[in-house]
Amino acid sequence: MLKSRVILAMDKPLSYQVLKEMENELYGIKVGLPLVLDLGVDKTRELLIGLDVEEIIVDFKLADIGYIMKSIVERLSFANSFIAHSFIGVKGSLDELKRYLDANSKNLYLVAVMSHEGWSTLFADYIKNVIREISPKGIVVGGTKLDHITQYRRDFEKMTIVSPGMGSQGGSYGDAVCAGADYEIIGRSIYNAGNPLTALRTINKIIEDKVMKCKGAIFRKK
């Protein structure tokens, strides 16, 4: 049984000891570019290797031609999955990245809707067409956009939906899951806390209680 609905967004370092204490309370870890710029690739790898989490996701929001994106991900082999933007299109870009990841048993998430206020939905149909053509493992839909989560869950019933923007960006814990997301991505509310483990446990309890009320179960059947 999966342990949690929470993916820890790591944009700044936490000690290995703290991460080991939290591993049983997490689904996964999302590695942000600021963390890798601070530590470097080798130290980031050393920090994460040995952690018992379901998924390590590198979130550089890749947005380039296929050759460049492949050159980036091949240097980050410690990760299970990678996040890329959808708007860059398929041919010569996401198609090449997806083939490379498939060949190396890695997963792809595509950004569908970002969590910030300025994100435009004018190109939503185009984004959805790209997602359908690429068929990634999952999609990223901002946790502050609950109506969009519900819409994307309806349109992409079997895909994993991960939702950032919970806590510090204004999303309420548990709301994204109730709207249709599988996991909520939470960073600053945990890693900036005086006791990250206590903060994580508190958040997990809030999510569990809310999801039990809205869905009657902690995890959905796929």
UniProtKB/Swiss-Prot annotation:
Pathway(s): Pyrimidine metabolism; UMP biosynthesis via de novo pathway; UMP from orotate: step 2/2
HAMAP family in the record: OMPdecase_type1_A
Catalysed reactions, semicolon-separated: orotidine 5'-phosphate + H(+) = UMP + CO2
Binding-site list for substrate: 11, 30, 59-68, 115, 164-174, 187-188
Family statement drawn from the similarity comment of this UniProt entry: Belongs to the OMP decarboxylase family. Type 1 subfamily.
A GO MF term: orotidine-5'-phosphate decarboxylase activity
Annotated InterPro entries: Aldolase_TIM, OMPdecase, OMPdecase_arc, OMPdeCOase_dom, RibuloseP-bd_barrel
Quaternary structure, from the entry: Homodimer.
Cited PANTHER family: OROTIDINE 5'-PHOSPHATE DECARBOXYLASE (PTHR32119:SF2)
Protein name listed in UniProt: Orotidine 5'-phosphate decarboxylase
GO cellular component: cytosol
Signal peptide limits: none
Gene3D superfamilies noted in UniProt: Aldolase class I (3.20.20.70)
GO terms of biological process kind: 'de novo' pyrimidine nucleobase biosynthetic process; 'de novo' UMP biosynthetic process
Residues of the active site: K61 (proton donor)
Pfam families linked: OMPdecase (PF00215)
